[in-house]
């Protein structure tokens, strides 16, 4: 499977480590995965001056045009994201779909290992949505909804048994 990771603003701490860790992690569920890095500018129209945040959905629209040869395109930004009705989001995806975006703005930590773990969890979570997985009631599952860092830190980076089965079923259908 070919994934493209688009660094939206070029200021993603530890980007190479994120790509390596994410590629290794999702290969456990998707088989051989290759992640290609690209860079892109944040779309100006996505920025809300009132909120000081970027509209996540607008970034998904930008990613849609980058699909090309890739099975999935995931954006990564250091800017804070929001969705209508929410103060912020760690990420957003088309469910099901081919595009997802994650912000590292609220995932940063002085401990580089904790930061890497958080980013991989949120990338995995949003990737799961692109394969049609919804939020999971199992609070340890990577597909559980997180509205705080505490919830991100609490959950596992892994899919629970139920979500793994759903993922495999959706992959067999052509994902």
Curated annotation (Swiss-Prot):
<dbReference type="GO" id="GO:0008270">
    <property type="term" value="F:zinc ion binding"/>
</dbReference>
<comment type="function">
    <text>Probable zinc metalloprotease whose natural substrate is unknown. Does not show endo- or exopeptidase activity against resorufin labeled casein, p-nitroanilide (pNA), amidomethylcoumarin (AMC) (one to three amino acids in length), and hippuryl-aminoacid substrates.</text>
</comment>
<protein>
    <recommendedName>
        <fullName>Archaemetzincin</fullName>
        <ecNumber>3.4.-.-</ecNumber>
    </recommendedName>
</protein>
<dbReference type="InterPro" id="IPR024079">
    <property type="entry name" value="MetalloPept_cat_dom_sf"/>
</dbReference>
<feature type="binding site">
    <location>
        <position position="129"/>
    </location>
    <ligand>
        <name>Zn(2+) 1</name>
    </ligand>
</feature>
<dbReference type="Pfam" id="PF07998">
    <property type="entry name" value="Peptidase_M54"/>
</dbReference>
<feature type="binding site">
    <location>
        <position position="160"/>
    </location>
    <ligand>
        <name>Zn(2+) 2</name>
    </ligand>
</feature>
<feature type="binding site">
    <location>
        <position position="163"/>
    </location>
    <ligand>
        <name>Zn(2+) 2</name>
    </ligand>
</feature>
<dbReference type="InterPro" id="IPR012091">
    <property type="entry name" value="Pept_M54_archaemetzncn_arc/bac"/>
</dbReference>
<keyword id="KW-0482">Metalloprotease</keyword>
<dbReference type="GO" id="GO:0008237">
    <property type="term" value="F:metallopeptidase activity"/>
</dbReference>
<feature type="active site" description="Proton acceptor">
    <location>
        <position position="126"/>
    </location>
</feature>
<keyword id="KW-0645">Protease</keyword>
<feature type="binding site">
    <location>
        <position position="136"/>
    </location>
    <ligand>
        <name>Zn(2+) 2</name>
    </ligand>
</feature>
<dbReference type="GO" id="GO:0006508">
    <property type="term" value="P:proteolysis"/>
</dbReference>
<comment type="subunit">
    <text>Monomer.</text>
</comment>
<keyword id="KW-0479">Metal-binding</keyword>
<dbReference type="InterPro" id="IPR012962">
    <property type="entry name" value="Pept_M54_archaemetzincn"/>
</dbReference>
<feature type="binding site">
    <location>
        <position position="141"/>
    </location>
    <ligand>
        <name>Zn(2+) 2</name>
    </ligand>
</feature>
<comment type="similarity">
    <text>Belongs to the peptidase M54 family.</text>
</comment>
<keyword id="KW-0862">Zinc</keyword>
<keyword id="KW-0378">Hydrolase</keyword>
<feature type="binding site">
    <location>
        <position position="125"/>
    </location>
    <ligand>
        <name>Zn(2+) 1</name>
    </ligand>
</feature>
<feature type="binding site">
    <location>
        <position position="135"/>
    </location>
    <ligand>
        <name>Zn(2+) 1</name>
    </ligand>
</feature>
């Amino acid at each position: 499977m070919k994934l493209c990771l688009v660094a939206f603003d070029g200021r993603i701490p530890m980007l190479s480590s994120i790509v390596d860790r994410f590629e290794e992690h999702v290969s456990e569920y998707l088989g051989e995965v290759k992640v290609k890095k690209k860079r892109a500018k944040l779309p100006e129209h996505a920025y809300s001056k009132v909120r000081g945040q970027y509209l996540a959905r607008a970034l998904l629209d930008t990613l849609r045009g980058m699909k090309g040869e890739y099975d999935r395109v995931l954006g990564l930004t250091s800017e804070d994201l929001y969705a209508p009705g929410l103060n912020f989001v760690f990420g957003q995806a088309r469910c099901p779909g081919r595009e997802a975006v994650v912000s590292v703005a609220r995932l940063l930590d002085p401990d580089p290992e904790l930061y890497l773990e958080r980013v991989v969890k949120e990338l995995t979570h949003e990737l799961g949505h692109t394969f049609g997985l919804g939020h999971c009631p199992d609070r340890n599952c990577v597909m559980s909804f997180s509205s705080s860092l505490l919830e991100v830190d609490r959950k596992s980076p892994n899919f629970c048994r139920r979500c793994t089965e759903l993922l495999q079923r959706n992959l067999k259908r052509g994902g």
